[in-house]
Amino acid sequence: MNLAANMKIQFRPAQKSDCRVIASLYSISSDGVADYIWTKLAQPGENILDVGQRRYERENSLFSYQNCTLVTLSQDDAETIVGMVVAFPMIVDETAEPEDDPVLAPYSKLEENNSYYICGIALFPDYRNRGIGTQLMRKAEVDAVAKGLTKLSLIVFEQNVAAKRLYERLGYHEVAREPIVPHPLIHYSGDAVLMVKEIG
């Protein structure tokens, strides 16, 4: 899909009314981890995107629309949401009980204290490979600085080679890894990798 010359890329804070599209994008970004969590929370017969939407409609929660920035394309006053980043300050609670779900436990071990944690970043397929993802990552850096943080962190699957290379190109480096517990809903096997970028 070619972007028209008069299309304008913009970033804006998400609103509660955006939570359905946030759920769709977060499902993409998590490569099955969100689907696993939402399936566990769903009522019998409930669409898991309904669960994701409901979770992101919450306020004063880490996984909230309040921690989401959307990237949009605007043309003639019409806005199309094409991607998003969900990020928040990561403060590790050393007294917290360890994650008791074996599928989720590896990810809970991959936390970088006092970092701006990018927990989800995604674009819809038609808008990939156009530099928009890099712009979203740069936007996260600006937001981290505004919050007084000097590093960013994220988790990537080692088998997601393209994403890992992008993060390395943007200055992220590996600091830890944990083996994934395989599950049919999770798209990758191998290791989950914690990557960090210092910005101050």
Segments from the language model and where they lie:
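Conserved acyl-donor/pantetheine-binding loop and adjacent beta-alpha core of acyl/acetyltransferases
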Residues: 86-120
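A short helix-loop-beta-strand connector motif used in the catalytic cores of GNAT acetyltransferases and
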Residues: 56-70, 90-95, 117
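Conserved GNAT-fold acetyl-CoA-binding loop/helix
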Residues: 31-56, 66-67
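Conserved acetyl-CoA-binding loop-helix of GNAT-fold acetyltransferases
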Residues: 123, 129-142, 146, 165-169
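Conserved GNAT acetyl-CoA-binding A-motif
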Residues: 116, 137, 144-155
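C-terminal "cap" of GNAT-fold acetyltransferases
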Residues: 103-104, 150-153, 157-164, 169-170, ...
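Glycine-rich acetyl-CoA-binding "A-motif" of GNAT/NAT acetyltransferases
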Residues: 77-83, 162
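Conserved N-terminal entry element of GNAT/NAT acetyltransferase domains
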Residues: 1-20, 28, 33-40, 197-200
